[in-house]
């Protein structure tokens, strides 16, 4: 293929965005995006979603034009402007840093939030433990974002920064307000309930960390290679025998145990909302595994062993 490539607006298919000449079939979608960005400065590479059909699936950056079945003389692609983009890593750092700042305000400065009612209030051990557990969780997330997760050049719409931060920061304030309140009601089963919840929380947190490390080691740096995730020598990774996304399983378990520890309705609501979203993500990844790997273990579920 060597010829002309016309790129139209995917939303207004009669709107010709740009015509590129001297196109070779060996050029990749990434190379085409770069050429478009050079002539249309507003359409940076990250904002472009190129497709063969206006409502078709976005093409991967490493796909070659010769593999798309296009005309060798005059080819047509469609582009959708994804809008201003922001790096995934930046969004993750912001959304996780917020709860690490918001929650301590309620714990360390209760009079600022609750007024004089907090001056003589006795802080229950569950409240103190919850503060350190919450802080550990989000400090771990920041550590993982900086040193464990691989993001490449992936981006997301800038609006996601507002949406994601609103979710995490808002829930941090919601949970913290009631857990640190001067009228906090201690767990019904006392220290046994608190320390049972703490033990489960700690195990789940390290389980989550273990899975993230395993997933990082599964894909060599600088490659797009994908392999079937399997347990390694760490016993916490054995959950891979039952679910495709044990990192989500451990994440949900952490918040279930946190909710047990503080016996707080806002914590339960936060846990439920998180599970609902992670279940959707897990099911999507589970379907992708089944589609990509013919020999993928059929007995695995997405997030809840034997159930979901």
UniProtKB/Swiss-Prot annotation:
A GO term for molecular function: very-long-chain enoyl-CoA reductase activity
Signal peptide: none
Transmembrane spans: 112-132, 169-189, 194-214, 255-275
Pathway: Lipid metabolism; fatty acid biosynthesis
Membrane topology: Multi-pass membrane protein
Enzyme class: oxidoreductase
GO biological process: very long-chain fatty acid biosynthetic process
Catalytic activity: a very-long-chain 2,3-saturated fatty acyl-CoA + NADP(+) = a very-long-chain (2E)-enoyl-CoA + NADPH + H(+)
Location relative to the cell: Endoplasmic reticulum membrane
GO cellular component, one term: endoplasmic reticulum membrane
Coiled-coil regions listed: none
Keywords: Endoplasmic reticulum, Fatty acid biosynthesis, Fatty acid metabolism, Lipid biosynthesis, Lipid metabolism, Membrane, NADP, Oxidoreductase, Transmembrane, Transmembrane helix
Domain Ubiquitin-like: 7-85
EC number per UniProt: 1.3.1.93
Known function: Catalyzes the last of the four reactions of the long-chain fatty acids elongation cycle. This endoplasmic reticulum-bound enzymatic process, allows the addition of 2 carbons to the chain of long- and very long-chain fatty acids/VLCFAs per cycle. This enzyme reduces the trans-2,3-enoyl-CoA fatty acid intermediate to an acyl-CoA that can be further elongated by entering a new cycle of elongation. Thereby, it participates in the production of VLCFAs of different chain lengths that are involved in multiple biological processes as precursors of membrane lipids and lipid mediators.
Family assignment from sequence similarity: Belongs to the steroid 5-alpha reductase family.
Protein name: Probable very-long-chain enoyl-CoA reductase art-1
Organism: Caenorhabditis elegans
């Amino acid at each position: 293929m060597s010829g002309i490539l016309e790129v139209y607006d995917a939303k207004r298919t009669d709107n010709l965005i740009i015509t590129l000449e001297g196109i070779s079939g060996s050029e990749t979608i990434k190379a085409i995006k770069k050429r478009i960005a050079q002539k249309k400065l507003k359409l940076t590479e990250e904002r472009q979603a190129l497709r063969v059909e206006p409502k078709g699936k976005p093409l991967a950056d490493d796909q070659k034009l010769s593999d798309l079945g296009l005309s060798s003389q005059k080819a047509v692609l469609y582009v959708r402007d994804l809008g201003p983009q922001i790096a995934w890593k930046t969004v993750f750092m912001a959304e996780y840093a917020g709860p690490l700042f918001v929650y301590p305000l309620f714990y360390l400065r209760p009079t600022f939030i609750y007024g004089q009612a907090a001056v003589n209030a006795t802080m229950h051990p569950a409240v103190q433990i919850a503060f350190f557990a919450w802080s550990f969780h989000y400090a771990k997330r920041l550590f993982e974002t900086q040193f464990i997760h691989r993001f490449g050049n992936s981006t997301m719409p800038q609006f996601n920064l507002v949406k994601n931060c609103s979710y995490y920061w808002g829930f941090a304030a919601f949970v913290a307000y009631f857990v640190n309140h001067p009228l906090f009601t201690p767990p019904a089963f006392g220290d046994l309930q608190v320390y049972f919840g703490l033990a489960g929380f700690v195990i789940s947190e390290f389980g989550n960390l273990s899975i993230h490390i395993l997933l990082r080691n599964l894909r060599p740096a600088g490659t797009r290679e994908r392999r079937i995730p399997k347990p390694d020598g760490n016993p916490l990774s054995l959950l891979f025998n039952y679910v495709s996304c044990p990192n989500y399983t451990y994440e949900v378990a952490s918040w279930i145990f946190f909710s047990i520890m503080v016996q707080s309705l806002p914590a339960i609501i936060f846990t439920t909302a998180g599970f609902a979203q992670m279940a959707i993500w897990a099911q999507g990844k589970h379907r992708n595994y089944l589609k990509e790997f013919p020999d993928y273990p059929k007995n695995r579920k997405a997030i809840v062993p034997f159930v979901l």
